[in-house]
């Protein structure tokens, strides 16, 4: 009986262990109810307000990634996000970063003299703001139980967004952790290219 209990325990934990590899927090792409709202947040480069509707206009697919620049898991994902953006931006794919829990100066230092490879805006600047952010609220809705939730990724299809409502979309594809590159690459391709094989990520 003891051996059976151990086997069951290992079986239950094995999927979690597979996603938490060597300090990574990989998470699958899933469709969730999120009630994602339009926003107007300050651009890291211009110090002016950027409206989300304007940023996504004319795009086929947009990945919004919420991140804290000091977070190791974000630093794991950052080159993947930049790579996917470079690969598909000519086909209508856009990445937008939303910085959290760090000052704008710290975010600028993180990206260095070259700057961010895609548009970045700021939602919060201190760790004390964690539970006050929309980022935190969305994470609760999508079942993200991590402490800081960095990175947290949501995919929007501009052609399907509500044209006038404050809520842009009730449901969206999200990743509650680091991107699984192959999975997300295929998903992006299925949305921005006509000839790519369509992948159907798991729904729950």
Give residue ranges: language-model regions.
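Hydrophobic beta-strand anchors of alpha/beta hydrolase catalytic cores
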Residues: 63-64, 95, 153
């Amino acid at each position: 009986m003891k051996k059976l209990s151990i086997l069951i325990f290992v079986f239950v934990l094995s999927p979690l262990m597979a996603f938490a590899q060597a300090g990574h927090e990989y998470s699958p792409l899933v469709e969730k109810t999120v009630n994602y709202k339009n926003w107007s947040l300050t651009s890291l480069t211009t110090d002016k307000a950027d409206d989300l509707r304007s940023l996504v206009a004319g795009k086929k697919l947009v990945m919004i990634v919420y991140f804290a620049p000091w977070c190791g898991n974000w630093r794991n994902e950052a080159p993947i996000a930049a790579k996917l953006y470079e690969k598909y931006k000519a086909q209508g794919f856009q990445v937008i970063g939303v910085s959290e829990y760090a000052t704008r100066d710290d975010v600028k230092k993180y990206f260095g003299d070259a700057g961010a490879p895609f548009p970045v805006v700021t939602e919060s600047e201190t760790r004390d703001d964690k539970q006050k952010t929309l980022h935190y609220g969305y994470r609760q809705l999508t079942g993200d139980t991590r402490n800081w939730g960095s990175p947290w990724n949501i995919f929007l299809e501009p052609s399907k967004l509500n044209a006038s409502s404050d809520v842009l979309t009730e449901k969206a594809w999200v990743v509650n952790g680091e991107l699984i590159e192959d999975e997300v690459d295929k998903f992006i391709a299925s949305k921005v290219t006509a000839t790519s094989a369509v992948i159907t990520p798991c729904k729950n």
